[in-house]
Amino acid sequence: MEIILSHKICLDPTYKQAEYFRQACGIARFTWNWALEEWKRQYDLGLKPKALELKKQFNALKPIDFPWMYEVTKYASQQPFIHLQTAFNRFFQGLGAYPRFNKKGHHDSFYIGNDHIKLDSKHIKLPKLGWVRMREALRFSGKVISATISSQANKWFVSLHVKLDQMPKSCESTAKRGC
């Protein structure tokens, strides 16, 4: 049985690292808003937009129109397309509301894939940034499959998604509520 758990850990970034986080969140927000606007435009023309097609169009524009995006991890400008596709799938299935534009400071976050993450006790290594101090060590042993960096009340957090082979003993009694 495959189990995936998340562990949200408070980060202790330097000023430079926090600036990087703000920039990556801004790029993720900009990309989402660009993709949503383009989706609406194409849909109004009678087309059936797809996230991968929009991503290809965006990547063709990026070197010329948005070169500043290369200053942070590539995931900041890739993952919003996947999230938008999921949001529209949920909308068309009647499971969610129509996707809306993102505003600065409202659920700021960005995703990082496991191929760009390294952990060392109370530190996480992020692409184009280096080692960032975590306030606690990861509680679960397993394969880290992704991370999401987010901001809440002027604090930065990393939510690590870990694939486990079995449920940790500390979680067995609270499995219904989550660990």
Question: Model-found features: residue ranges?
Answer:
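Nucleic-acid substrate recognition interfaces
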Residues: 1-179
